[in-house]
Amino acid sequence: MKKCICCELGYVDDGGDGICTVCGWQDDDIQNDDPDFAGGANELSLNEYRRKFKEKRKINSNYVWAESKT
């Protein structure tokens, strides 16, 4: 397991394509290396996803992606 590059709160499996249960970011080496690249495993770029996650946490400081999917 490694710390999520997007939210730095959750963890993803080593070896690629794990999904963080805190923010929902799917680990993608290309997007991790180029944070402005949209596409690949995630529709949004890493920078866009970080911004949206931070906005959600401002509205609800306890927001967790995994809970929003149920």
Regions found by a protein language model. Give the residues of each.
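Residues immediately within or flanking Cys/His clusters that coordinate Zn2+
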Residues: M1, D17
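Short Cys/His-rich micro-motifs in 6-15 aa windows
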Residues: W25-Q31
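Short, low-complexity, polar/charged sequence segments that are solvent-exposed and flexible
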Residues: C23-W25, G39
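Short, intrinsically disordered terminal segments enriched in charged and Pro/Gly residues
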Residues: N32-T70
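Cys/His-rich microdomains that often coordinate metals
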Residues: G10-V12, D27
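Short cysteine-rich clusters marking metal-coordination/redox-active sites
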Residues: C4-C7, C20-C23
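Generic, low-specificity signal for short hydrophobic/alpha-helical stretches with a mild N-terminal bias
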Residues: K2-I5, Q31-P35
